[in-house]
Amino acid sequence: MQKPITGGRAALLLALLPAAPGIAAQLETVVVTGSRAPQPVSELAASIRAVSSEELQLVRAVHISEALSRVPGTWISRGNGQEHLTAIRSPVFTGPGSCGAFYLAEDGLRLRPAGVCNVNELSEVNSEQAARIEVLRGPGTAVHGGNAQHGVINVISAPPPEARDASLTLTGGPNGYARALGSYGDRTDNGAWRLGLNTTHDGGYKDDSGYDLQKLSYRHDAEWSGVTLQSLLSLGNLEQETAGFVIGQDAYEDSDRQKENPNPEAFRDNQVARWYGRFTLDAGPGVLSVTPFYRYQDMRFLQHFLLGQPLEENGFKSSGWQSEWRVALDDALELVTGLDGEWSTSFLQETQRDAVPGNSVLPAGKHYDYEVEGLNGALFAQLAWTPLAATRIDAGLRLEHQRYDYDNRMLDGATREDGTPCGRPGAPVPCRYSRPADRVDEFTEPALNLGLVQDIGGGQELVLSYAHGFRPPQSAELYRLQAGQLVADIDSEQVDNIEAGWRGTREAVSWQLAAYYMQKENIIFQDAERRNVGDARSRHRGIEYSVDWRFAEHWALAADGTYARHRYDGNAPLQGLPAGTGIDGNDMDTAPRAMASVRLRWEPREHTTAELEWQHMGRYFLEPTETHDYEGHELLHLRLNQQLSRHFSWSVRLTNLTDEQYADRADFAFGDYRYFIGEPRSLFVDIGWQL
């Protein structure tokens, strides 16, 4: 019986695969996000786009949004500095738990423990030195479970080299931007290792802004006595001076306001550490893999976007394991089953230095101080059946349990820190911030997926799939309450997705097309009275495409994009809406219908690549009534990469070639428009050295 390809054999296979510069080799690209083991995209009943190493090196992203703009249905909405919000087959979600809709991972392991997500957590992974970034769109498979509701972003670490190797890339750009990416690795008697260092300084385009960022990745692979080990240590440190929203309708079109920063006092400091070790060995007729891991994070930042600008301090420690046993039951049937577990302890404190003038419900002092102990356990099974040579059927089921043990370290209730009410003497009122009493909350949910891949000949395939996903409430949604609410009676969000696809390669053209329809229930939101409730619904449908056409010997045209509608299903009483406002069928806010990246690539000779990218962002509404909107924008980017010799290379990147005035993110809140203004035309130069 042939054993599945896993462990050290998997690492070797992935290391030997050539990187695809565009979409042309996507069907042959091997990914691990769908099942935790190397698998060609052509075998998966899912929509996965892998941004290859060559693409990452050509883009040399200053912000991860630049690299992922070429993934259909995906928008990493850039804030200031390293900040961002995520959208995959969804609007851009905001709010304390909205990030729970996405499974953000490094080598298949979540960047943060279940229930403790952060909207900016992609900044905590060394994507700048990754082997590739895999994006699965739609609910994940049985190996993911909670949080893989709208999609998965999996950053794959660079493997150790086959022989001693070293590289250094220096980047310079506007506003004092400077970055050094260094890598060194070698082989040992029973394995190999690689050390990656990333240090970046950005002086900031906006006034009184900028950041210093350091990341380290140490990958070590080894094999002894029939056991293979893949391990990774990741460290990160961010010190950021944050610029806030610029207020006023169409402010991004005013040349005198391009560098404006209304919040020069804002900052974000964040330190992270992660380690895992994946041990793989033969076990009976199959292969067993066990991956213990550890995570640590500590953050301080000023909430400049809130009245009173309270200081938030948060962090966590977590440890656990992933496990799986992979066995071929016969020549046509493979089973993957496993047990995952995780423990975490997290904390959050919020303190406001000064009272807000004229607003008695926002007092100075401490608002929150709590700890949460989290336990997460899951059992899963995934079957792959090939009844005919041209037919593959996948089915997966996961049962996941999440438990929170919450400890309030302040007085219970909606009072000041000392227990006195807010308001005026003789007219007491509850304070804005509410602290529940100590409690335990538990959630148990299933996730399942079913898919069919049918080879119809001529290098073409048809794909049909159904998936059910969920996300438990995040701890902040349960315990960081407002407006006198002392119990958040909310349950897990649920999503059902059906999808059909057509993909193939024919002569000089490769393509992937997908159409999906998704329904969500129990959506958690803050209502008009600032209470966390969970009874909203939404509908999502769209078409996604990836096409690569090599129309001449040295020329190729690639396009990735989406046309989608994300709409409210019902009249949820969202915060800020007058009572009785009808929004059923309206577009959700910050949900552009059309997004696209089209790239013309020219390779006149070996080691020379030029790329012109057109990036389209469609119009979107800024609030649920469809009264205020952002018109969208078109950007052009030019990139040139030249290998000078075996040891030296250089590249030039000109972003926003036409100097378009645009907004990276537009919003409407507190009665006015506000924007993160996009940066003007910018020139970046890279000089690279390779051993």
Where are these predicted regions, by residue range?
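Membrane-embedded beta-barrel scaffold of Gram-negative outer-membrane proteins
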Residues: R278, P285-Q303, D455, E461-A467, ...
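Solvent-exposed loop segments that connect transmembrane elements
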Residues: A243-N261, L306-L311, L348-H367, D405-V440, ...
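Gram-negative outer-membrane beta-barrel transporters
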Residues: A328, T386-I393, H401-Q402, S510-K520, ...
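Structural signature of Gram-negative outer-membrane beta-barrels, strongest in the C-terminal barrel
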Residues: A328-V336, D340-E342, Y370-M518, R550-A552, ...
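Short acidic/polar hinge/loop motifs at secondary-structure boundaries
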Residues: L109-R137
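Transmembrane beta-barrel wall of Gram-negative outer-membrane proteins
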Residues: D165, G172-H201, K206-A243, E265-V287, ...
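Conserved C-terminal beta-signal and adjacent last beta-strands/turns
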Residues: L13, S234, L383, V453, ...
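Extracytoplasmic beta-strand/coil segments of soluble accessory domains associated
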Residues: S65, S69-L109
